[in-house]
């Protein structure tokens, strides 16, 4: 938190194929060791597979999957008088998107398919139809917040 002025958010250029900032952000999250071209190849390959299997616009399916994975509430630890409480808090819009992307990528990597393209395509299709581990993670997060609703008055 700077004292002088608010730090401006870095502008992310849209991706070359779909001209979409969310896809570009997803590529940046997917990328390892700065290999952006590999990240782009993976996501565009996954989009091709989604289009082939569902006969639908892959960008629409991807955005639907992302919306299905976005959490609304999460719990944060708050220490009050020697006890630590899990306090439910609402998630900011930019953090929702970031968490959804992170979960989609993490659970894609843990899937059983052979290549990352197949794993990501499978997880996107599952998430778009409200199935899969990323959606389960969101449900678990919501359940935790619901279970700890009694501590909501500890919000800061």
Swiss-Prot record:
* Name of the featured protein: Small ribosomal subunit protein uS7
- Cited CDD domains: uS7_Bacteria
Q: A GO molecular-function term, please?
A: structural constituent of ribosome
Kindly give the SUPFAM superfamilies that the UniProt entry links to this protein.
Answer: Ribosomal protein S7 (SSF47973)
Per the record, the similarity remark reads:
Belongs to the universal ribosomal protein uS7 family.
User: Which InterPro entries did the record assign?
Assistant: Ribosomal_uS7, Ribosomal_uS7_bac/org-type, Ribosomal_uS7_CS, Ribosomal_uS7_dom, Ribosomal_uS7_dom_sf
One cellular component term from this protein's GO annotations in UniProt: small ribosomal subunit
Q: Species lineage, top-down?
A: Bacteria, Pseudomonadati, Myxococcota, Myxococcia, Myxococcales
Its GO biological process annotations read: translation
Q: What's this protein's function?
A: One of the primary rRNA binding proteins, it binds directly to 16S rRNA where it nucleates assembly of the head domain of the 30S subunit. Is located at the subunit interface close to the decoding center, probably blocks exit of the E-site tRNA.
Q: Which HAMAP family match?
A: Ribosomal_uS7_B
Instruction: Give the PANTHER family listed for this entry.
Output: RIBOSOMAL PROTEIN S7 (PTHR11205)
> Subunit details for this protein?
Part of the 30S ribosomal subunit. Contacts proteins S9 and S11.
What is the gene called?
Answer: rpsG
Q: Which UniProt keywords apply?
A: Ribonucleoprotein, Ribosomal protein, RNA-binding, rRNA-binding, tRNA-binding
The record's PROSITE patterns line, in alphabetical order, gives: RIBOSOMAL_S7
